[in-house]
Curated annotation (Swiss-Prot):
Biological-process GO terms, alphabetical: proteolysis; recombinational repair
Xref: PANTHER family: DNA REPAIR PROTEIN RADA (PTHR32472), DNA REPAIR PROTEIN RADA-LIKE PROTEIN (PTHR32472:SF10)
Free-text function comment from the UniProt entry: DNA-dependent ATPase involved in processing of recombination intermediates, plays a role in repairing DNA breaks. Stimulates the branch migration of RecA-mediated strand transfer reactions, allowing the 3' invading strand to extend heteroduplex DNA faster. Binds ssDNA in the presence of ADP but not other nucleotides, has ATPase activity that is stimulated by ssDNA and various branched DNA structures, but inhibited by SSB. Does not have RecA's homology-searching function.
Residues covered by region (Lon-protease-like): 351-455
Protein name: DNA repair protein RadA
Organism field: Chlamydia muridarum (strain MoPn / Nigg)
Molecular-function GO terms, alphabetical: ATP binding; ATP hydrolysis activity; ATP-dependent DNA damage sensor activity; ATP-dependent peptidase activity; damaged DNA binding; serine-type endopeptidase activity; zinc ion binding
Amino acid sequence: MTTTKIKTQWACSECGSYSPKWLGQCPGCFQWNTLVEEIHSSKLKTSSYPLSSTTPVPLNTVKFQEEIRISTRSKGWNRLLGGGTVCGSLTLLGGEPGIGKSTLLLQISSQFAEQGYKVLYVCGEESVSQTSLRAQRLQISSSNIFLFPETNLEDIKQQISDLAPDILIIDSIQIIFSPSLSSAPGSVAQVRETTAELMHIAKQKQITTFIIGHVTKSGEIAGPRILEHLVDTVLYFEGNAHTNYRMIRSVKNRFGPTNELLILSMQTDGLHEVENPSGFFLQEKVVETTGSTIIPIVEGSETLLVEVQALVSSSPFSNPVRKTSGFDPNRFSLLLAVLEKRANVKLYTSDVFLSIAGGLKITQPSADLGAVLSVVSSLYNRYLPKNYTYTGEIGLGGEIRHVTHIEHRIKESIIMGFKGIVMPSGQIKGLPKEYLDQIDIIGVKTIKDAVRLLQ
């Protein structure tokens, strides 16, 4: 009589790498306390995927076929995905619990259903009545949306075969399990295998699939890193529970540009696209105040204006405080060091706080100039030129370096009615004459030149 040998392995919940024994730190991604136990059978496992019968073909003989895309009423959603949702694609939507992922996909499902597409919504985390109540609140009622409260992957595959949907939504991948695996739902093996199975179904049957995934405390999608490599598109749902706006950012897209940004407003009847993001973020700006600048930032094909606020106060302690919100703290420390060294602005006895108004997170270096001038304005309690925007990267030598998409930043400043823009002097030459006629452009070469703008 033969017995099946059981083998224990430890898998990292962050990157999916394996270790034969428990380790405090993952050898793959170097994260701490991420290894979880998994039990594997030595019994030979056969793949459930059919063997491929295709043969290699020369590259120059392949005929290009344009992807078939499904458009919705939301222009922002279509832009986010590169011109519409590609048929047969697999999209991963990640976000914190309660931020509105299910609400968003239910609204998108309604727009698909309006066009006659059949939608299978697998609501594994909620009952049919709970999902139906949400649909009523969103004023959604369609005979083309089918709710299926199931977590067993085999039952889901059977319903896909019977119903033949055009759109499949999995809410959420962390609760779906395959009975062929002994590990618990949400484990590394379950998330990896169920996603791979769904990807195969999406490609084989040309079913457009959306998967909801929860994020960890660090803001990354929970589960192995390979999850993001398997799917075609990765969208991050960002926002704050204390504000009524949400942002969706595309960090991966095989069928379109990345780093696209969609800003939504959460209201009682669901999520609504914000058509004027710059006006949305500047609507609460105080007209006359020190320590405040407006900077133009570019997110994908979208340009928007946001406010940078700084507060500098004397510190009673030997180690002054440096705090940021929405701005890279390491980058901020570097900018303060350059400010002291190259512009002789003394901050070693002051607490310095910097915030991006509205809760946005900015990583692009074009925000350097606005951040530094906000700090200096607050320190000296002096005003900067009124109705100007500021853009420029600051180097370690104190020089103001070029930024990308400068024409887009100038154009957005003109549209929003600003009087002028402060920018790197080296980029003024070559600008279209129409911009020079519509807005006052001030060029700065160094950080010292920028500080002299203070009244």
